[in-house]
């Protein structure tokens, strides 16, 4: 079996690639850090190396990114190239969408770009499966995320008093959900931990392990949603989702193991 992963050096892509490799799958990684632009690759490679599936994980992933041109290129133009190439080659496409694509949650260009991808795939590649991911966390998190700051002992200031509620979903569960999507004939599914937790409680769960410095601010950002809801009209992959308490413990176990080596 042969799988192509765009963004295979990113937080989620790398975890997915490792899991597939452990299962004996041949993985081809397309990533900007390797000097390969996903859009260029899919614009020029007609047979997709006879892949069985393409996992499109490459994207600008921050709701804080205000570089509209960059988001348009990386999240929309590149997605269109990948989606079209998979349709031409008759190859299954699984792509990362986001909880921010759920209409009540869409308050940034990032969310708009993800919603566009869902609609584009629905119209032009109905075999594709989009996976709405919800606040993914785990060991070696992406730089600049809340968990990254907490793990690097950076003082963290939580807006809106830390009351914003999210469905923090552990990386291993996300990987299993993405693998499930390969054999799924639905156009759009959720991978979301059913456990709701405030951002403050998440930070406190981390603080129990490393005494991170946390302060609460009353201000609220314009694009913030107090509750990042899960669209219950969509199928949610039935997994034994990892509790946040257990997930954070695994994060620190990984740090301890890496330190000991």
Predicted regions and their residues:
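Conserved Rossmann-fold NAD(P)-dependent oxidoreductase catalytic core, especially the SDR/UDP-sugar
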Residues: 77-111, 129
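N-terminal Rossmann NAD(P)H-binding glycine-rich loop of SDR-like oxidoreductase domains
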Residues: 3-23
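C-terminal substrate-binding subdomain of Rossmann-fold SDR/epimerase-dehydratase oxidoreductases
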Residues: 158-261
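Active-site segment of SDR-like NAD(P)-dependent oxidoreductases
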Residues: 60-62, 98-103, 107, 134-137
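SDR active-site strand-loop-helix element
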Residues: 6, 30, 54-58, 93-99, ...
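Conserved cofactor-binding/catalytic machinery of classical short-chain dehydrogenase/reductase
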Residues: 53, 78-81, 92, 116-117, ...
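NAD(P)H-binding glycine-rich loop region in Rossmannoid oxidoreductase-like domains
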Residues: 38-74, 100-101
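NAD(P)-dependent short-chain dehydrogenase/reductase
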Residues: 107-111, 115, 119-166, 171-173, ...
